[in-house]
């Protein structure tokens, strides 16, 4: 059986690189909308979906969606320890891990990825910056999670050390995560069917092409 695990940082620290553009409440609402989009895409591909966080608000929000909440132990430090803690609670044999900032996941991509999974394998989907935006472990404890930094290469190395079958899946939609204001532009181009897009539109945010080599988009917020 396959579970999905979505780690979420405490909402007090969420998406700090957007703080000059979005208020604290807006950043919290943004991550909730991305989480909702993520859950709607993964739920049909897995047997159960979990969220791990230290944040009671996000755990309650997740529970109301039908996601199983895991309250991080107070002694866990960082993302990787939170994931390891969760893997010892999750009852399913294998697990698909994806961060809560990947709003463009497509159900058809996930179905294709899940079908590739075999026993003693690791499926890795990189982010644009060399991180990992999706990691499918079969079985769930076959490697130690190595998120943060150039985690794509770290996960490959960890899988090689453990003599596992390594399956690399390069997908544009899976590679997009939201960390900066400019990243929001990808949602306006590729995510018009998402709740995240509707949320941003309701804030009167618009994206325009940038006609220079300095970036991809101009993201503006119209006065109401």
Swiss-Prot record:
Nucleotidyltransferase among the record's keywords?
yes
Q: Which InterPro entries match?
A: CofC, Nucleotide-diphossugar_trans
Entry EC number(s) = 2.7.7.68
Reply yes or no: does the keyword Nucleotidyltransferase apply: yes
Pathway field of the UniProt record reads: Cofactor biosynthesis; coenzyme F420 biosynthesis
Q: Which protein family is named in the record?
A: Belongs to the CofC family.
What is its biological role?
Answer: Guanylyltransferase that catalyzes the activation of (2S)-2-phospholactate (2-PL) as (2S)-lactyl-2-diphospho-5'-guanosine, via the condensation of 2-PL with GTP. It is involved in the biosynthesis of coenzyme F420, a hydride carrier cofactor.
Name assigned to this protein: 2-phospho-L-lactate guanylyltransferase
Organism, by scientific name, is Methanococcus vannielii (strain ATCC 35089 / DSM 1224 / JCM 13029 / OCM 148 / SB)
